[in-house]
A protein has these predicted regions:
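ATP-binding glycine-rich loop module of kinase domains
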Residues: 13-54
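Protein kinase-like catalytic core scaffold
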Residues: 35, 70, 84, 140-142
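Hydrophobic residue at the +6 position relative to the catalytic HRD Asp in the kinase catalytic loop
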Residues: 127-132
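Conserved alphaE helix
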Residues: 106-117
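The N-lobe alphaC helix and its flanking beta3-alphaC-beta4 segment of protein kinase-like domains
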Residues: 49-67
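Conserved structural core of kinase catalytic domains
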Residues: 69-108
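Juxta-kinase regulatory segment immediately upstream of eukaryotic protein kinase catalytic domains
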Residues: 1-13
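C-lobe/activation-segment region of protein kinase-like
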Residues: 120-124, 135-177
Length: 177
């Protein structure tokens, strides 16, 4: 089994959870508990410009925590290896729930509440449905990325297009099977 370290502590890699603009997220275990280990990558992204990705993640995490965004706790950062260890929140992603046609009004209500915290703070997050996990009835934002608010990228203008089986969602799904 493959292992990865964070600040010299070893974790067994269970599986790849996903790849985003900034890194790869793995489900890992120390033998007692499961975590998410995010490895920052430096692959080009033609639609997004980054500075220091790790520092951005750490800064964004603090900003979103201050706003009360439900998220996994940041447990550790390994600056040398550009890795972040996060709390693992088990549950289905909104993406999976869209596929099953199980997104509920309560999920949308929780997103509206979240937007009421974000927008007055001049903040957008990445509303793509793979970035949200439902656990114990709570909607968690499992990414730490945030950006200055722009209406073109807010939930009502952009994000909602991927929270049901819209043409945009179906096109994305067809391209990523």
């Amino acid at each position: 089994m493959e292992t990865m370290t964070v600040n010299d502590r070893e974790y067994q890699v269970r599986r790849l959870l996903g790849k985003g603009k900034g890194g790869y997220s793995y489900l890992v275990s120390d033998g007692k508990q499961e975590y998410v280990l995010k490895q920052i990558h430096h692959e080009p992204c033609d639609y997004y410009q980054f500075g220091d990705k790790l520092q951005s993640e750490l800064r964004d995490y603090q900003h979103l925590m201050n706003l009360g965004v439900p998220m996994p706790r940041l447990l550790e950062a390994d600056l040398r290896q550009e890795r972040i260890l996060k709390e693992y929140i088990p549950g289905d992603t909104i993406y999976t729930l869209v596929q099953r046609e199980q997104v509920t009004e309560d999920h949308f209500r929780q997103m509206e509440e979240l937007c009421r915290r974000l927008y007055p703070a001049d903040t957008n997050i990445d509303y793509f449905p793979t970035n949200f996990v439902v656990s114990g009835g709570v909607l968690y934002y499992v990414d730490y990325e945030c950006n200055p608010y722009q209406q073109a990228w807010d939930f009502e203008t952009w994000g909602i297009r991927y929270w049901s089986k819209t043409p945009e969602f179906l096109e994305y799904e067809a391209l990523h099977r």
